[in-house]
């Protein structure tokens, strides 16, 4: 669904990285799977599950859909690789973050430490940011991918202020 927004993002990327803004909303694993099955190379930053068997099972399932996993602790090097591969990078930003990796933004009226990685990557790489979510329809196992309008990241020359502003805009989606 919303193919026009998707095409706008791909065109804006001019063959480079596209950042997919998402969160742990609905069956977000299906969102990643759907993009991979449509032939778009997908990369995803993830935190290993506490249970190694479950972690391996999820890793294998994601790999079958063409998803390349970037471990949270080693993601920086992987993101540089994605820049060269011109793929999609999916970053769910809705998890609590450390002071070192995040910035505090308003989340439903409450200050919340939010990972600023997407804002930093968008600002440094000039990559378009596309909000995308998956929504279940009714009681059947039917889902619809919702792609929202591209978010332009503003650059003022003050990197930290730009990161703060962009992260707040992403969180508001």
Q: Each predicted region: which residue ranges?
A:
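Non-catalytic C-terminal accessory region of glycerolipid acyltransferases
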Residues: 3, 12-14, 37, 41, ...
